[in-house]
């Protein structure tokens, strides 16, 4: 019975693998997009950003300056250490944890072995 199920799985896998392979009957690949031949367009001048105000005279705001390169000096108010909440478990607790996992796996293995023996005849 197990052999028949295994063969069925192998046949289904082979059929799926053959179906996913590319064949000579596949649709041709689409044509490549034509190369663009745009002429270079100069960048527009800095726009005039008007600040909104209740005053009748609107004055354009100056363009933003480029950011200065990062300095490696003081970070000002952000110099505190980041708190660390993750600590190492003591060795004894870690050893007990691994022992419990091993015992649980052993118990599961013995249960499955016992169920297999009960179904057999001597």
Curated annotation (Swiss-Prot):
Keyword 4Fe-4S included in the entry's annotation: no
Lineage per the UniProt record: Eukaryota, Metazoa, Ecdysozoa, Arthropoda, Hexapoda
UniProt-annotated location(s): Secreted
Chief location bin: secreted
Protein's UniProt name: Vitelline membrane protein Vm32E
Gene for this chain: Vm32E
One GO biological process term: vitelline membrane formation involved in chorion-containing eggshell formation
Purpose: Major early eggshell protein.
Keywords, sorted A to Z: Secreted, Signal
Taxonomy, superkingdom: Eukaryota
GO molecular function: structural constituent of vitelline membrane
Entry's family note: Belongs to the vitelline membrane family.
Range of residues in the leader sequence: 1-19
Species of origin: Drosophila persimilis
Keyword Signal: yes
Domain VM: 40-79
GO cellular component entries: egg chorion; extracellular space; vitelline envelope
